[in-house]
From Swiss-Prot:
Belongs to the bacterial ribosomal protein bS16 family. One of its GO terms (biological process) is translation. It comes from the Bacteria. Transmembrane segments: none annotated. This is Small ribosomal subunit protein bS16. GO terms for cellular component: cytoplasm; small ribosomal subunit. Keywords: Ribonucleoprotein, Ribosomal protein. The keyword Iron does not apply. Gene3D superfamilies: 3.30.1320.10.
Length: 90
């Protein structure tokens, strides 16, 4: 089972709001997911990003691959750098 960390679209038409979820890569974008690890609201200025750092690091260590957008969000929050330091022992 290939696990991805990706965005699940919520909100109304023309007003997107996203949940950052861990899901099987074969499930639909807004379909079944394993766990919610955060939220992303691109409408606010500046964009509001809330991610549970412990859960994100746990899933990254277990081999979950982030989507391109989620990878950018994780790096903005400094989580990818912490994961890199944990993985390579710096």
């Amino acid at each position: 089972m290939a696990v991805r960390i990706r965005l699940k679209r919520m909100g109304a038409k023309k007003k997107p709001f996203y949940r950052i979820v861990v899901a099987d890569s074969r499930s639909p974008r807004d379909g079944r997911f394993i766990e919610t690890i955060g939220t992303y609201n691109p409408i606010t200025e500046p964009a509001e990003i809330k991610i549970d750092e412990e859960l994100a690091l746990k899933w990254l260590q277990n081999g979950a691959k982030p989507s391109d957008t989620v990878r950018n969000l994780l790096s903005k929050q400094g989580i990818l750098e912490k994961f890199h330091n944990l993985k390579y022992g710096k």
